[in-house]
Amino acid sequence: MSWTTPKKAILLAASAEGSTKLNAFDNALLKMGIGNVNLVKLSSVIPAYIEWIDELPKNIPVGMLLPTVYAHIESDEPGSTITAALGVGISEGNEGGLIYEYSGYCTKEEAEKMVHKMVEEGFKVRGWKLKEFKAAVAEITVKDRPVAAIAAVVMLPY
């Protein structure tokens, strides 16, 4: 197999219930449109000049390996609120960027604040200038079934 530098990326987030925590995770992936592919977990560097898209292509083959940065959390504790978040920082001139993940028992606002802080620090230590920050956040509260929250950046080779 050969890898190529991704050309496009999309920021996604979803939450879902399921009969088990794993089923809740799978259901959230399906909601995002990435439940029938294989996610290859990446660390958090965005390639230069990547194009950000708003919608997944319709022609992604079942079982395709998709480079993905993601945060996730599952719970079956009634009354608990869980959140997964990704913060994306894009440099001036789109010459690269960073993605930071966070998940925990917290609100959407707390999680987004955390990833924003992480992105700012990541840029600072590299001496990069942050042009744009965006976030994907999913929050859900457990009722009577297990739940999952996922935030992801999926990178596409085409």
From Swiss-Prot:
Annotated keywords: Decarboxylase, Lyase, Pyruvate
HAMAP family xref list: PvlArgDC
Listed cofactors: pyruvate
InterPro entries registered for this protein in UniProt: Pyr-dep_his/arg-deCO2ase (IPR016104), Pyr-dep_his/arg-deCO2ase_sand (IPR016105), Pyruvoyl-dep_arg_deCO2ase (IPR002724)
Source species, domain of life: Archaea
GO BP annotations, alphabetical order: arginine catabolic process
Residue ranges that the Swiss-Prot or TrEMBL entry lists as coiled coil: none
Protein species of origin: Thermococcus sibiricus (strain DSM 12597 / MM 739)
GO molecular-function terms, A-Z: arginine decarboxylase activity
Catalysed reaction equations from the record: L-arginine + H(+) = agmatine + CO2
Protein name (record): Pyruvoyl-dependent arginine decarboxylase
Modification Pyruvic acid (Ser), positions: 44
Homology family: Belongs to the PdaD family.
Cofactor comment text: Binds 1 pyruvoyl group covalently per subunit.
EC number(s) on file: 4.1.1.19
Record site feature (Cleavage (non-hydrolytic)), residues: 43-44
Keyword Lyase: yes
